[in-house]
Amino acid sequence: MXYLPGPQQQAFKELQGL
């Protein structure tokens, strides 16, 4: 995935943290 800046990036980071 690419890099997603903004609030989407935070949600994506939580998905990877699972």
From Swiss-Prot:
Signal peptide: none annotated. GO terms for molecular function: metal ion binding; oxidoreductase activity, acting on paired donors, with incorporation or reduction of molecular oxygen, reduced flavin or flavoprotein as one donor, and incorporation of one atom of oxygen. It catalyses: an organic molecule + reduced [NADPH--hemoprotein reductase] + O2 = an alcohol + oxidized [NADPH--hemoprotein reductase] + H2O + H(+). It comes from the Eukaryota. Its main location: endoplasmic reticulum. GO terms for cellular component: endoplasmic reticulum membrane. Coiled coil: none annotated. Its EC number is 1.14.14.1. It is a peripheral membrane protein. Keywords: Endoplasmic reticulum, Heme, Iron, Membrane, Metal-binding, Microsome, Monooxygenase, Olfaction, Oxidoreductase, Sensory transduction. It is found in: Endoplasmic reticulum membrane; Microsome membrane. Its cofactor is heme. One of its GO terms (biological process) is sensory perception of smell. Belongs to the cytochrome P450 family. Cytochromes P450 are a group of heme-thiolate monooxygenases. In liver microsomes, this enzyme is involved in an NADPH-dependent electron transport pathway. It oxidizes a variety of structurally unrelated compounds, including steroids, fatty acids, and xenobiotics. This is Cytochrome P450 2A. It comes from Bos taurus.
